Regions:
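Metal- or metallocofactor-binding catalytic centers and their adjacent structured scaffolds
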Residues: 39-120
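Structured beta-strand/loop patches that form or line metal/cofactor-binding pockets in enzymes
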Residues: 1-53
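Catalytic pocket of metal/acid-base enzymes, prominently hydrolases
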Residues: 116-130
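Glycine-rich, flexible loop/turn motifs
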Residues: 13, 17, 76, 120-124
Length: 130
């Protein structure tokens, strides 16, 4: 199966909660995340979600498409560690919240693992030893 990365797609999701959850320093009225899909030349699509806040979702999306995607398009999707190293510089920008780069990198990493598990027809939890 050809795991050459041909496209990266993201979708920002915001879902209201039925009730408000409160902690000592916060309240949650909704859940937010970014869904990432990686498409391959062989037709497989990996999918994962990461993040859980409104703040920064647009910037995370931008980091994925403007900083990470151009570097990994055309690469072998099974080379997960190598692609993580390629994506990692997105975490180095000291002028922005480092967490945003970490979530963007995690989004790609999780999606690559899902893609790899699908290529082996193995559930991801089994691939990881569960």
């Amino acid at each position: 199966m050809d795991l050459t990365i041909t496209a990266i797609e993201t979708e920002q999701i915001r879902v209201p909660l039925v009730r408000t959850y409160r902690g000592s320093h916060y309240k949650m009225t909704h859940r937010s995340t970014i869904i990432t899909r990686i498409h391959t030349a062989g037709g497989l699509v990996g999918e994962a979600y990461a993040g859980d806040e409104d703040a920064g979702l647009a910037e995370i999306d931008s980091i994925i498409h403007e900083e990470i995607a151009p570097k990994i398009l055309g690469e072998d999707g099974s080379a997960i560690e190598r692609l993580w190293e390629i994506a990692r510089p997105a975490t180095w920008d000291i002028l922005r919240d480092r967490r945003l780069g970490l979530v963007a990198t995690a989004s790609i990493d999780l999606t690559l693992w899902d893609l790899y598990a699908r290529s082996l027809s193995t559930p991801l939890h089994k691939l990881w030893g569960g």
